[in-house]
Amino acid sequence: MLYSPRLTDQILIVAGEASADLHAARTLHELQRLRPGITAFGVGGPRLREAGLEALAPAEDISVMGLAEVLPRIPRILGILRMLGRAAAERRPRAALLVDLPDFNLRLAARLKKLGIPVVYYVSPTIWAWRQGRAKKIARVVDRMLCILPFEERFYEGTGVSARFVGHPFAERPPPGPAEAYRSALGLPASRTTIAMVPGSRPSELKRLLPPMLQAAERLRAAHPDAQFVVPVAPTLDRAALEPYLAAHRTLEVRLVDGRTEEVVGASDAALVKSGTSTLEAGLMLRPMVVVYKLSWLSYAVARMLVKIAHVALVNILAGRGIVPELLQGDASPERMAAEVERLLGDRAAREAQIAALREVRASLGEPGAPLRVAEEVLGVMR
């Protein structure tokens, strides 16, 4: 079936991992409110599908991080890229909203540019950290670059990229309440020491991070017999994906919660959090945390050569200094994780200093209303 841009308000949306799926879904809701009858097709996760996206492929098929992880998936990823190009050529959407996922989305943007389809790119690639030469390609294939970090718009000055800081989607969130309120909402005992563990939204992250997190939890339980551990299950994962890891720790009390990462962190006295968007999501809850991450040896070796920033945790990057501990690769051991969490549980001055710095980060994210501003940008470029 052929779709005429004169007869339908249809847009293409592509979002990969869980955070992008959430940001895109909120934007689609705003588009539907501003332009009743608008429809969307593309690639997204459960939240985008709930918002009405016609999903042509599942988000997890293109949401892969790390060179070693990407290589075996290349045929499938390229197949989806070609499929979306064909769908765009047939349906002729009036605009495309591409969210994060730069290695995939910039290639798709180039195809869309040849078709004359305007491209709005939401969540800038981290060109300020590595591969800065991508700015030239962005200038060629992206009509509007919408930045969610306050320093990114300035970075694009002089590159030919039409960029705008729209505020961070997390700025929508109200200030956090007391931990006891979140524990009550999650059905957790209010008086027990509570430790959140946020291992990520990808199977590869679970494989590398959840086992040492659980081993660290065993060590922490020895020091805190009343401790309870809570793990949010990302919307892109099924609980069954976690079961093999939990089976090795049957005596450890671990509560799984579907989604609700901010509530899980809000319920905690301290948290172990995977590096990435999760660190900002957790940081906005103003709870002490330790950031951890592991890549394959090949991916890590490549990253060390290319990355040009001092910190990897988003809250540290925004603060301009190391306000939360970062445990990477070999340092992300059960012993180090447990020791850093123990320090945050026992050292009141360290806790208060980290929380004060996280308040500053929260204040830097701009005013609420990012989904509305993104929707207005999409409508502004529609042919």
Swiss-Prot record:
Its EC number is 2.4.1.182. Pfam families: LpxB. It catalyses: a lipid X + a UDP-2-N,3-O-bis[(3R)-3-hydroxyacyl]-alpha-D-glucosamine = a lipid A disaccharide + UDP + H(+). It is an enzyme of class 2 (transferase). Keywords: Glycosyltransferase, Lipid A biosynthesis, Lipid biosynthesis, Lipid metabolism, Transferase. One of its GO terms (molecular function) is phospholipid binding. Pathway: Bacterial outer membrane biogenesis; LPS lipid A biosynthesis. GO terms for cellular component: membrane. GO terms for biological process: lipid A biosynthetic process. It comes from the Bacteria. Condensation of UDP-2,3-diacylglucosamine and 2,3-diacylglucosamine-1-phosphate to form lipid A disaccharide, a precursor of lipid A, a phosphorylated glycolipid that anchors the lipopolysaccharide to the outer membrane of the cell. Belongs to the LpxB family. NCBIfam families: lpxB. This is Lipid-A-disaccharide synthase. The gene is lpxB.
